[in-house]
Design a protein with these regions (language model features):
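Active-site-proximal specificity loops/subdomain of glycosyltransferases
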Residues: 3-6, 10, 41-95
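Short, well-formed alpha-helical segments that are part of the catalytic scaffolds
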Residues: 12-29
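A short acidic, amphipathic alpha-helical/loop segment
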Residues: 21-22, 47, 109, 113
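Short beta-strand/loop segment that forms part of the nucleotide-sugar
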Residues: 26, 31-40, 61-63
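Catalytic-site signature of metal-activated, phosphate-bearing donor transferases
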Residues: 71-78, 82-85, 103-322
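The conserved acidic donor/metal-binding loop of glycosyltransferases
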Residues: 97-101
């Protein structure tokens, strides 16, 4: 079995992503690692090119994203992942984002499970445990799904994209999504239907326990924490650092992610305090000091927050430690 890892990068230096550690972890258990750059202008692409000169397992390419396109979100995410995937020459593919890491202790477990799935041709897509850090003080979120799709068979019909039932078109024929996808679903290119996948556990049971833990049930919270620790011991686990530096994440949301989601879902949202889920003021009035103060408070008073609604400081969200 040959295992290909793949990922995408864009201005990772300026955005302070742990991209080098992420790619190094892929190199630790993959036979090749394919990386597509979206047109970085902060030195990321140049550093990747230098790295490529000394690392024989790296396969790199650049596809410059047009950030003025109305569908730049889909172009820079789902489609860009597909471009990276199509560089893969292995039997199996492992996709990872550049704010995710597999630790060295999990390399052998990862290879063993990949080989097991490779020898079961009925499985085309497999999920793996995920822990998402909230701040730098050891909190792990319980308000997000504890898994991600990561291992797939290198079937050339499989791409990343918007499932057909959630795909819409603008008047200029560019594509956007309805709520329910981030454009990175594993779908079949010809039918735009979702690729069936295998879960690593009884996720209905775990999500029910997680819901009770989120609601404040201490017994459920203890069970969920012990289950998470057990999964980490048994299976390779994705460690997600998206919210590890909350201040950085909020700054990125101000400059990029708020526009990204408008592009993804074809929304036009005015910059008002009512539409800002993080602050009671428009983004144009938010200062770096505002961001620093909010990040400190979120890290110390909350265990996570999904910013589909304004922060409710009276509803203290739960977290676990591992």
């Amino acid at each position: 079995m040959k295992l290909s890892g793949y990922t995408t990068v864009y201005n990772c230096i300026n955005n302070e992503y742990p991209w080098e550690d992420s790619i190094k972890s892929l190199l630790g258990f993959c036979d090749e690692v394919c990386v597509v750059d979206g047109g970085s202008d902060d030195g990321t692409w140049e550093k990747l090119q230098e790295w490529n000169k000394t690392e024989s397992k790296l396969v790199i390419d650049q596809y410059i994203v047009d950030w003025n396109r109305p569908d730049f979100a889909y172009e820079s995410d789902g489609r860009q992942k597909t471009r990276s995937r199509k560089l893969c020459s292995g039997d199996m593919c492992w996709q990872m984002d550049v704010d995710e890491i597999i630790v060295q202790e999990d390399y052998e477990k990862t290879r063993n499970i990949c080989l097991e799935i490779y020898n079961n041709p009925q499985i085309e897509l497999m999920t793996f445990p995920l822990i998402e850090y909230w701040g730098s003080n050891g909190k792990v979120r319980i308000d997000v799904n504890p898994w991600k799709w990561r291992l797939s068979r290198n079937n050339p019909k499989i791409i990343h994209g918007i499932p057909g039932d959630l795909l819409k078109y603008r008047e200029d024929n560019t594509e956007y999504a309805l709520q329910g996808t981030d454009s990175c679903d594993y779908i079949y290119e010809d039918t735009k239907t979702r690729v069936p996948f295998v879960l690593f556990c009884d996720m209905n049971k775990i999500n029910n326990i997680r819901a009770h833990a989120n609601a404040g049930n201490q017994q459920a919270l203890d069970f969920y924490e012990n289950w998470t620790k057990s999964m980490i011991n048994q299976m390779p686990t994705i460690r997600h650092y998206s919210w590890h530096n909350i201040e950085r994440k909020i700054k990125n949301y101000k400059t990029h992610w708020s526009k990204f989601w408008c592009s993804m879902y074809n929304k036009s949202i005015d910059d008002t305090k009512e539409n800002n889920m993080m602050f009671d003021k428009p983004w144009s009035e938010v200062t770096d000091n505002d961001i620093k103060e909010l990040a400190f408070r979120l890290e110390n008073e909350m265990g996570g927050w999904i910013f589909h609604q304004k922060i409710d400081w009276d509803r203290k969200t739960k977290s676990i430690t591992i």
